Amino acid sequence: MQRQSKRGVCSRIVVGQLCVAITSLAFSIACVPPMWAAAAHGPLVRAVESVGMTVADADRSIDFYSTVLSFQKISDTELEGSDYEHLEGVFGLRMRVVRMRLGDESIELTEYLSPKGKPVAMDSHSNDRWFQHIAIITVDIDRAYAWLRQNRVQHVSSAPQTLPAYIKPAAGVRAFYFEDPDHHPLEILEFPSDKGNPKWHRSDGKLFLGIDHTAIAVANTSVSLAFYQDVLGFRAVGESENYGPEQEHLNNIFGARLRITSLRGVEGPGIELLEYLTPRGGRSMPVDEQANDLVHHQTRLVTDDLEAALKALQEKHYPLVSSGIVALPKAEIGFHFALIVRDPDGHPIELAKR
């Protein structure tokens, strides 16, 4: 009986050791991160590379951005074919893509030669969630505003506004909203001496210096941060709650109270999330919005690992515009691979890899 008991004890020890080994192996397998978890070791997205807008007449837009806002034309290309159809989600497209630069930052103006899309709704407001603008830095907003008036731009703001001291993160910032010929909202912005990137305080005699950020209207900041911060790897670098008569007249929204969150990548301009706490009546992005519609903006982000980015987006069920990762062998837009996805509010985001 005693020998049997020893054998039983030994058996239990062996079985126990085997269970520990199996458990350890299972734990090790469970702890292997998924492919897209590279974001834990570094952001999936490195930079905002450019902001794109669909325009009705490329020549008219080139003239506006170069003559009025001092952008320089860098390239002018016509694109067509199945690769771009699969990327943009528009069948039978032929588009003229014009790249323009101001300082270190770039925009892309895209005219769809075929097929033509819908115009911007004339009753659009700053709290509608198709709203997106680029913030163009000036060293002298009074002189810049006078220049815009001379060129008969369409106002959104009633006049340039100086944000008050009680909005501490934005105190002293001066800004003005207006529109380009296709009714895309734009902002000119002047930072006080204690705010903004140091390069925005070196004018070299120029009136307009570059693009600080692009701002988008969102329904819920936390939901948007799950996309931009948790998945793509942007850093939240500032937040404020803006309200009062100056903010109302800047946005031209009575009773405007906004939660504003500033995001930055490793390089390039930032992204600002604009959540209207009041009024809450902003309309959602149209479900039938397409790249050839004039309301369309497309923010291009650079990634070193497009496959990991796609995996992360699919894991979270963010809707793709593209059929998947699209190969662009000729790299006419400067990238060999790209895809377009919609953020939680429907804003189109292009992820591109050289």
Model region roles, listed by residue range:
Residues 1-14:
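N-terminal secretory signal peptides that target proteins for export/translocation
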Residues 36-43, 46-57, 96-109, 120-207, 239-264, ...:
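Vicinal oxygen chelate
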Residues 54-105, 150, 166-170, 217-270, ...:
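Core segments of cupin and vicinal oxygen chelate
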Residues 117-118, 184, 282, 347:
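Short, charged/polar, Gly/Pro-enriched secondary-structure boundary elements
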Residues 69-71, 109, 186-189, 234, ...:
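Fold-core signature of tandem repeat domains
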Residues 59, 63, 67, 72-79, ...:
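Extended intrinsically disordered, low-complexity coil regions enriched in Ser, Thr, Gly, Ala
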Residues 16-34:
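Bacterial N-terminal signal peptides
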